[in-house]
Amino acid sequence: MFVTFEGIDGSGKTAQLTAAGEFLKASGKQVVLTREPGTISCIRDYVLASDMDIRTEALLYSADRAENIAKNVIPALNAGKVVLQDRYLDSFLAYQLADNKLVETDIMRLFEFSSQGLRPDLTLLFDLTPACAQERLENRDRIERKPIDFHSKVRNIYLKLSADNTDRIRVIDASQSFSKIHQQVIYHIERKLGGTHSA
């Protein structure tokens, strides 16, 4: 099963992904944790630190995705493992569209090519206001330092995507306590896996 964790910077999705991975491993599941970008370390370092043309940025993200899907995600899924990924389709759409420089058809064309058309079985969207998220962030990278209006656009795009994809995306209120959020994460994952767990 392929589960993606989405949300604006500072929403807490990465910490929840780590906690979910530990829980599933303790439950006897084989789990692989991945992130986007991150497969090709030099690409991650470059896109998070350098100003660049929006097309260059989209292509670099896509190159990293292509490598991750081919080398990590698909082999793990074929082996029956649970893949938990930090950012994927919805982040790519939300952040690229928020810049208002690329059209959705071009973004999706890049995504389809780089992802081999692979869609998540489940997406957990950690929703938080940009003002609250900004308070949590320290040592911000290039994207995290963008104006709050940009992050508001990203959040609104995420929420629209969730409304358009209710079969796949589950929205979680990220202003709750860590333990409450964790319970909801496990509930949604186990429900998708076919198990039972009370939220």
Curated annotation (Swiss-Prot):
The keyword Transferase applies. It is an enzyme of class 2 (transferase). GO terms for biological process: dTDP biosynthetic process; dTTP biosynthetic process; dUDP biosynthetic process. ATP binds at G7, I8, D9, G10, S11, G12, K13, T14. Belongs to the thymidylate kinase family. Phosphorylation of dTMP to form dTDP in both de novo and salvage pathways of dTTP synthesis. This is Thymidylate kinase. It comes from Tropheryma whipplei (strain Twist) (Whipple's bacillus). The gene is tmk.
